[in-house]
């Protein structure tokens, strides 16, 4: 047994990729994607027909240039998702345009539109997770969508207050970003990269213990890892989403059994409180790291989303 097989005994290993070749190779149950991954894979020969189909769809829908770009993007998400769902048994996480991260109503409308497109191809809601940035508006939109039978993956989680708000809203799954949290502390507090204290891992523990203590049903999926030790440190978490590179490394790594699982300690000193909007915003604002990393994460996804938009725009202008 290798390290990957050992981890799979306790934690669902999700592949963070849009690469069909790697997904076929490692056969994960579930897959996550984001604008950066879609941009990377959109340049491949395999995805070119999917891009052209999205363009054709958008042109048929008509409307102004903005409508064309929105429709092309949405259809591309569905096209890629359909291809991936053909080779996995579980779910795919599809990210909503991050420009809607602060618009409650627009997030709901876009999510329902994308789900409707999937449904039109015979794909049920239970195969899709709608990824939304964990802003206050995003969390409230997810709360509404969950009540409507649309499960969500709240991403860019950098603080316990975001996680609590998601759990209170009965969100299906959250994705704490382990590596990016640690990056911030290394940069701002000169934390040694080899330090045994990993703030990103600590955040996942804190969230997981809190959920366990108070019986929340929201799943915790660790994301954004920088090294193997971070991954191994949260074995026992509901899920982890990792790149094909990490999957390959774990697959070739000799077995190292873990003594202290994340599930062992269910103690949490934090009291359960229902968060109102003003309390959420105040507590979140006090966490410099979380504010900075959420903002940065949205900007980075937007950067890559704009590159996809530019591709569609060129195709539109060229006829």
UniProtKB/Swiss-Prot annotation:
Its main location: cytoplasm. Keywords: Cytoplasm, Pentose shunt, Schiff base, Transferase. GO terms for molecular function: transaldolase activity. Pathway: Carbohydrate degradation; pentose phosphate pathway; D-glyceraldehyde 3-phosphate and beta-D-fructose 6-phosphate from D-ribose 5-phosphate and D-xylulose 5-phosphate (non-oxidative stage): step 2/3. Its EC number is 2.2.1.2. Pfam families: TAL_FSA (PF00923). GO terms for biological process: carbohydrate metabolic process; pentose-phosphate shunt. It catalyses: D-sedoheptulose 7-phosphate + D-glyceraldehyde 3-phosphate = D-erythrose 4-phosphate + beta-D-fructose 6-phosphate. The active site is at 131 (schiff-base intermediate with substrate). It is found in: Cytoplasm. It is an enzyme of class 2 (transferase). InterPro entries: Aldolase_TIM, TAL/FSA, Transaldolase_1, Transaldolase_AS. One of its GO terms (cellular component) is cytosol. CDD domains: Transaldolase_TalAB. Coiled coil: none annotated. HAMAP family: Transaldolase_1. Homodimer. Transaldolase is important for the balance of metabolites in the pentose-phosphate pathway. Belongs to the transaldolase family. Type 1 subfamily. PANTHER family: TRANSALDOLASE. This is Transaldolase.
């Amino acid at each position: 047994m290798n390290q990957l097989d050992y981890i799979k005994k306790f934690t669902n290993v999700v592949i963070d990729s849009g690469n069909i070749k790697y997904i076929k190779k490692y056969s994960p149950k579930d897959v996550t994607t984001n604008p950066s991954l879609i941009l990377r894979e959109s340049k491949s020969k395999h995805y070119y027909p999917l891009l052209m189909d999205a363009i054709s769809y958008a042109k048929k829908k008509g409307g102004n240039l903005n409508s064309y770009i929105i429709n092309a993007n949405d259809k591309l998400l569905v096209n890629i998702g359909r291809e991936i769902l053909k080779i996995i048994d579980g779910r795919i996480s599809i990210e909503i345009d991050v420009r809607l991260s602060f618009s409650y109503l627009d997030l709901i409308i876009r999510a329902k539109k994308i789900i409707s497109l999937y449904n039109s191809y015979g794909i049920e809601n239970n195969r899709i997770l709608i990824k939304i940035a964990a802003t206050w508006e995003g969390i409230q939109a997810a709360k509404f969508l969950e009540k409507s039978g649309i499960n969500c993956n709240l991403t860019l989680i950098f603080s316990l207050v975001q996680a609590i708000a998601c759990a209170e809203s009965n969100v299906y799954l959250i994705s704490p970003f382990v590596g990016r949290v640690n990056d911030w502390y290394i940069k701002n507090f000169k934390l040694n990269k080899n330090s045994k204290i990993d703030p990103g891992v600590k955040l996942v523990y804190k969230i997981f213990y809190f959920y366990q203590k108070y019986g929340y049903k929201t799943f915790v999926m660790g994301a954004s890892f920088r090294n193997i030790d971070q991954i191994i440190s949260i074995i026992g978490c509901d899920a982890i989403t990792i790149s094909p590179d990490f999957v390959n490394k774990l697959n070739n790594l000799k077995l190292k059994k873990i003594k202290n699982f994340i599930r062992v300690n269910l103690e949490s000193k934090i009291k359960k409180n229902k968060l109102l909007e003003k309390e959420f915003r105040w507590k979140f604002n006090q966490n410099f790291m979380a504010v900075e990393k959420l903002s940065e994460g949205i900007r980075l996804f937007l950067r890559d989303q704009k590159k996809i938009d530019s591709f569609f725009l060129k195709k539109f202008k060229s006829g």
